[in-house]
């Protein structure tokens, strides 16, 4: 399985693709939030061998275009709460 982590900010995102046990499939790269670049990203992710799952944090409204384009392309997309991700990373459970 391919695990895609996307760090979303205003106007651009940083994308990294890994497999279990830390195998890097695609080194981190930047994607601008233009229709062409997001569609290119969707194509690049769909071309990967095996199942691909995308996770990104909810960041104001910035994440929405990224999530919608990838979802509309048929990719599994999970938008997560950043506070929950911080708690998990710090091993704090509610």
Give the location of each predicted region.
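Phosphate- and other anionic-substrate recognition elements at nucleic-acid/protein interfaces
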Residues: 1-94
């Amino acid at each position: 399985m391919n695990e895609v982590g996307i760090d979303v900010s205003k106007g651009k995102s940083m994308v990294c693709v890994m497999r279990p046990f830390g195998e890097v499939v695609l080194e981190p790269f930047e994607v601008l939030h233009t229709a062409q670049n997001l569609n290119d990203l969707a194509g690049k992710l769909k071309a990967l061998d095996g199942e691909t799952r995308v996770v990104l944090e909810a960041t104001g409204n910035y994440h929405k275009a990224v999530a919608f384009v990838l979802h509309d392309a048929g990719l599994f997309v999970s938008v997560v709460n950043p506070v929950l991700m911080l708690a998990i990373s710090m091993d704090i459970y509610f």
